[in-house]
Structure formats: structure tokens, C-alpha cells
Amino acid sequence: MERMLLLSPPSLAARPERLNTILSSHSRYATDLQMLDRVAAGLVSLPQSTYDIVMLLTDVDGLGTGSTSAMGRGVIQSVVRALRPGGKFKRENGTFPSTECPDNTELMLAGLVFDDTGGLLKPDFGPENIVPLKLGKRKPVHSVSSNGTGTSGPHVNMQLSTGSMLKGQTTTIKGVGFVDFTDDPSLSEADIYSGQTDDELIDEETLLDGEDMGRPIIQPPECRPKAGKRRRACKDCTCGLAERLREEDKAARAKADATLETMKLAPKELAEVDFTVQGKLGSCGNCALGDAFRCDGCPYIGLPPFKPGEEVRLLSNDVQL
């Protein structure tokens, strides 16, 4: 019994009486019904090589424009896979247009062909057969035997069961040929791999003259400094910006190191202040000169100038100016 698949456009879903009329004219045991929009959306997958006939139903208006517009490439490929070899794909209201119609391009690209009745047919190429390929006979190789006579036939390495060669016959095993890519065939292999050849080496510096060396270096736009930002060199800078920035950083680092060297104090230049012993001065040496010359953390802040080592006394807790 032939299996049939009915593809219904979405407009027939609102007319159940129309669907019942169509289904009543076909066998319910061998007929399946699928909505075209669900197949196009991928919600329904059609079984492969199952149906002998796939019929595309028309719309409610009978024109078939809705069903034709929903037949995309994915739906056509699903229909072709669902057809058995030799199966037919046809429309309810008649045949498909001629092969010159642009709407049939996807149908023909999917592998369907037009039959005599105007429908589309999936070709049946029959079962796959294995075709043996016969190789031609090997051409005989002409060789010269030990006695000087020419012989023809395949070059066979003949050996006895004991592994010894036949007396009076010598065989030569042909190896794999190598291709020599050198231009000079007179060079030995050692000279080629060692690089000792007569080829003249060209110094790159001789290719530039004084005029070329004096030309200004054209700086690419991406290497030019931007306003408010420090210039940065590219990763593979060739305009000299990387070397210039490296020299500037080196000079700035040397200047900072020189400044730090002048600020360093030797151990002999450091003095420890002990305020419990009279006659000791601070490391700045300005403690006795007054507040104008004292440091922020000096313990003598607020006291009048005094001589080093002199005991200062304030009478009646009055500040002496």
C-alpha cells in the first residue's frame, strides 16, 4: 500500500470541515497529515524514505499562494528526504508550473525532476553497486644479464629457501630517486650543506647611498604623539621612536640616580640627639637659633634662642620676647 503525506497550509487549520473532507477521500491507515508551518519551523521532523506520494494542499481561497510561499529550502529538503526513490511530489489543484518558473529552482536543486504528467519525481538510481577497477599490467623492464644478453620481464629478486642468491646471477635493488634542487650540479653535498659556495654575498649597507641615509624618517600616523598623552612606540617599530624613547628613559633614570646620590648622607654625617644630656645639638644645628630656624618636630619649639648647652629658665611662666 502506498504511503501518502498531506502538507496543509496554516489557513486550513481554521477550516476543520475542509480537512475532514480531504482526509475522507484517502485511506487513514496509509495517510499522514502535517501542517506546513510546523515543518518549516522545525517542530516536526519527517521520517526519511517513507512516503510514496507527498501532496501539497491548497489554501482556503484555492489559489495556493500561501502554501507556495511557505515552501522554503528547508521544507523542500525535508520533503525530498521523506520521499522514497521513485516517489512523487504533487499539488492538490494540479501540476507544478513549467521548469522556467523561478519558484521551481529550489525544487530542481533539491534533486527533483519533472515527469510526463507535470509532477515532480524523485529519481531512483537503484542500489549502490561496487564497480571493480582493473589495473593494467606492469610494463616489462629490459635489463642486461651477467652474460651480456638482454632480458625482458619484471625485475625479481630471486632467492633460495636457504636465503642464498642463485649462482651466476646478481640482482640490484632500485632505491628511491632524490631530486637535486641546486643550480650547480658540480657542487658536492658537503659544500651545499656547509654553505661554502661561490655565490657572492651582497652587503645591505652598500645598497644605500649618502642621499638615502640623509632622508628624514617618515613617521607613521599611528606613531605620532597625541595631545595630552605620552608617545608610545609600536611593538615592531621601525621609525626610530622606540630607540628615542629608550634613550630618554635612560637619561631620566641617570638624572634621578645622580640626584639621589647627592641626597645620601654618610654614617659620619649623621648625629643622634639626646635631650637628657646638656650641650647636645640636633642634626640640623639650628635648635639654638630660634623657632624660625627650627624643624617641625624640634623639641625646642616655643623656647627663645639660647646658647648651645645653656640651661634656659622661664620666670613666672611668662613668654619672653
Swiss-Prot record:
<keyword id="KW-0001">2Fe-2S</keyword>
<dbReference type="Pfam" id="PF05093">
    <property type="entry name" value="CIAPIN1"/>
</dbReference>
<dbReference type="InterPro" id="IPR046408">
    <property type="entry name" value="CIAPIN1"/>
</dbReference>
<keyword id="KW-0004">4Fe-4S</keyword>
<feature type="short sequence motif" description="Cx2C motif 1">
    <location>
        <begin position="284"/>
        <end position="287"/>
    </location>
</feature>
<dbReference type="GO" id="GO:0046872">
    <property type="term" value="F:metal ion binding"/>
</dbReference>
<keyword id="KW-0963">Cytoplasm</keyword>
<feature type="binding site">
    <location>
        <position position="237"/>
    </location>
    <ligand>
        <name>[2Fe-2S] cluster</name>
    </ligand>
</feature>
<feature type="binding site">
    <location>
        <position position="239"/>
    </location>
    <ligand>
        <name>[2Fe-2S] cluster</name>
    </ligand>
</feature>
<dbReference type="GO" id="GO:0051537">
    <property type="term" value="F:2 iron, 2 sulfur cluster binding"/>
</dbReference>
<feature type="binding site">
    <location>
        <position position="234"/>
    </location>
    <ligand>
        <name>[2Fe-2S] cluster</name>
    </ligand>
</feature>
<feature type="region of interest" description="Fe-S binding site B">
    <location>
        <begin position="284"/>
        <end position="298"/>
    </location>
</feature>
<keyword id="KW-0479">Metal-binding</keyword>
<comment type="similarity">
    <text>Belongs to the anamorsin family.</text>
</comment>
<dbReference type="GO" id="GO:0005758">
    <property type="term" value="C:mitochondrial intermembrane space"/>
</dbReference>
<dbReference type="Pfam" id="PF16803">
    <property type="entry name" value="DRE2_N"/>
</dbReference>
<comment type="subunit">
    <text>Monomer. Interacts with TAH18. Interacts with MIA40.</text>
</comment>
<feature type="binding site">
    <location>
        <position position="295"/>
    </location>
    <ligand>
        <name>[4Fe-4S] cluster</name>
    </ligand>
</feature>
<dbReference type="GO" id="GO:0051539">
    <property type="term" value="F:4 iron, 4 sulfur cluster binding"/>
</dbReference>
<keyword id="KW-0496">Mitochondrion</keyword>
<feature type="binding site">
    <location>
        <position position="287"/>
    </location>
    <ligand>
        <name>[4Fe-4S] cluster</name>
    </ligand>
</feature>
<feature type="region of interest" description="N-terminal SAM-like domain">
    <location>
        <begin position="1"/>
        <end position="131"/>
    </location>
</feature>
<dbReference type="GO" id="GO:0009055">
    <property type="term" value="F:electron transfer activity"/>
</dbReference>
<feature type="binding site">
    <location>
        <position position="223"/>
    </location>
    <ligand>
        <name>[2Fe-2S] cluster</name>
    </ligand>
</feature>
<feature type="binding site">
    <location>
        <position position="284"/>
    </location>
    <ligand>
        <name>[4Fe-4S] cluster</name>
    </ligand>
</feature>
<dbReference type="GO" id="GO:0016226">
    <property type="term" value="P:iron-sulfur cluster assembly"/>
</dbReference>
<keyword id="KW-0411">Iron-sulfur</keyword>
<protein>
    <recommendedName>
        <fullName>Fe-S cluster assembly protein DRE2</fullName>
    </recommendedName>
</protein>
<feature type="region of interest" description="Fe-S binding site A">
    <location>
        <begin position="223"/>
        <end position="239"/>
    </location>
</feature>
<dbReference type="InterPro" id="IPR007785">
    <property type="entry name" value="Anamorsin"/>
</dbReference>
<feature type="region of interest" description="Linker">
    <location>
        <begin position="132"/>
        <end position="213"/>
    </location>
</feature>
<comment type="function">
    <text>Component of the cytosolic iron-sulfur (Fe-S) protein assembly (CIA) machinery required for the maturation of extramitochondrial Fe-S proteins. Part of an electron transfer chain functioning in an early step of cytosolic Fe-S biogenesis, facilitating the de novo assembly of a [4Fe-4S] cluster on the scaffold complex CFD1-NBP35. Electrons are transferred to DRE2 from NADPH via the FAD- and FMN-containing protein TAH18.</text>
</comment>
<keyword id="KW-0408">Iron</keyword>
<dbReference type="InterPro" id="IPR031838">
    <property type="entry name" value="Dre2_N"/>
</dbReference>
<feature type="binding site">
    <location>
        <position position="298"/>
    </location>
    <ligand>
        <name>[4Fe-4S] cluster</name>
    </ligand>
</feature>
<feature type="short sequence motif" description="Cx2C motif 2">
    <location>
        <begin position="295"/>
        <end position="298"/>
    </location>
</feature>
